């Protein structure tokens, strides 16, 4: 999913992206001429103060370095898969820091609330804690999520929770399980309000 920062040029009646192929998260807080100020986070880095200027991100702070230097984090991997009816779904999974593809790990499926919300590859302390405790953490954007167009978000109208979003979530579990490192007897679900 995407929620890009865009510039609207009223004189030219044009819209352009501030960053191309941006997959992380930037919480915009202020604009000064051509410079944007905010908080920048990735799937493996908590938020830091940053600017965007001339299409480039510059991180200004290192508030989290003291804490991060004491821990090993698991790697976050993006996945794209299809539900049984052919619907394309995007998600991510985090593996434990000492991940070994030949071992079996318990799985935690994280489900977002909303339903009109979406996950992005942003840092989440709880998810990294689960991964540090030896779990694979899966989070996806099933039907009803924003960031994939209004048709994808609104397909669940009058059907939430419904078969489409459930099918998408279960297909994500199947996709990660098929990778061969999930203990199918130890799967858990954690979610937010819906």
Model-derived features: positions:
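Conserved beta-propeller blade repeats
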Residues: 1, 21-39, 67-78, 128, ...
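A flexible loop/linker signature enriched in serine peptidases of the S9 family
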Residues: 1-6, 21-23, 40-50, 142-144
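Cap/lid segment of the alpha/beta-hydrolase catalytic domain
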Residues: 55-56, 61-192
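Hydrophobic/aromatic beta-strand positions that recur at structurally equivalent sites within the blades
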Residues: 6-10, 52, 94
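Beta-strand C-termini and the immediately following turn/loop, strongest in propeller blades
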Residues: 1, 9, 32, 37-43, ...
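Short, exposed beta-strand/loop patches in secreted or surface proteins that constitute
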Residues: 5-7, 27-29, 57
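Short, intrinsically disordered, charge-balanced linker/junction segments flanking boundaries
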Residues: 1-3, 191-194
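A short beta-strand motif characteristic of beta-propeller blades
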Residues: 14-19, 59
């Amino acid at each position: 999913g995407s929620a890009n920062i865009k510039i609207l040029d009223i004189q030219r009646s044009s819209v352009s992206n501030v960053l191309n192929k941006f997959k992380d998260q930037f919480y915009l807080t202020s604009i000064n001429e051509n410079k944007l100020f905010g908080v920048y986070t990735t799937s493996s880095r908590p938020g830091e103060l940053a600017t965007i200027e001339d299409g480039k991100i510059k991180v200004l702070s290192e508030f989290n370095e003291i804490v991060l230097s004491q821990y090993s984090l698991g790697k976050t991997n993006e996945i794209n898969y299809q539900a049984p009816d052919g619907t394309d779904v995007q998600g991510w999974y985090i593996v434990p820091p000492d991940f070994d593809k030949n071992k079996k790990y318990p799985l935690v499926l994280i489900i977002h609330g909303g339903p009109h919300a979406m996950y992005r590859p942003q840092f989440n302390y709880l998810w990294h804690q689960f991964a540090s405790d030896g779990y694979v953490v899966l989070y996806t954007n099933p039907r009803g999520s924003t960031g994939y167009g209004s048709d994808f978000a609104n397909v669940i109208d009058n059907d939430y929770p419904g078969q489409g979003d459930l099918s998408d979530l279960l297909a994500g579990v199947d996709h990660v399980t098929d990778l061969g490192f999930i203990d199918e007897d130890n799967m858990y679900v954690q979610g937010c309000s819906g």
